[in-house]
């Protein structure tokens, strides 16, 4: 489906809504996050210690890179995310389906 990367890993989303982390040098799969199974998920976005994905119901999900755990969900209500989020430091910016530019800080995720 789509991918993102950092210095050591690849992050891939697939058609089943799964998010995978692979070692860049060996290709070995290290974890799979299946909480969004059967959702149509966006391309992943790598942000510091997190990977972000959105789904068509209007939520942005935060996954911890270290272990693949889902650590945050930000709901947009009736709006959906259009395109891929843009990252600046710990702030994520995205356009919603109503045409509004929104932002969230992900620094305090656990």
Q: Which role fits each region the language model picked out?
A:
Residues 28-35, 69-77, 107-110:
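Aromatic (tryptophan-biased) beta-strands that constitute blades/sheets of beta-rich domains
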Residues 1-19, 33, 37-61, 80-106:
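Repeat-blade elements of multi-bladed beta-propeller folds
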């Amino acid at each position: 489906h789509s991918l993102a990367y950092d210095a050591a890993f690849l992050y891939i989303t697939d058609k089943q809504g799964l998010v995978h982390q692979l070692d860049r040098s060996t290709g070995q799969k290290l974890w799979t996050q299946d909480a969004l199974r059967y959702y149509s998920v966006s391309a992943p976005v790598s942000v510091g210690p997190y990977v972000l994905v959105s789904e068509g119901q209007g939520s942005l999900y935060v996954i911890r890179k270290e272990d693949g755990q889902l650590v945050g969900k930000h709901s947009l209500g009736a709006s959906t995310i259009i395109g891929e989020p843009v990252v600046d430091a710990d702030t994520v910016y995205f356009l919603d389906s109503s045409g509004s530019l929104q932002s969230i800080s992900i620094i305090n995720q656990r």
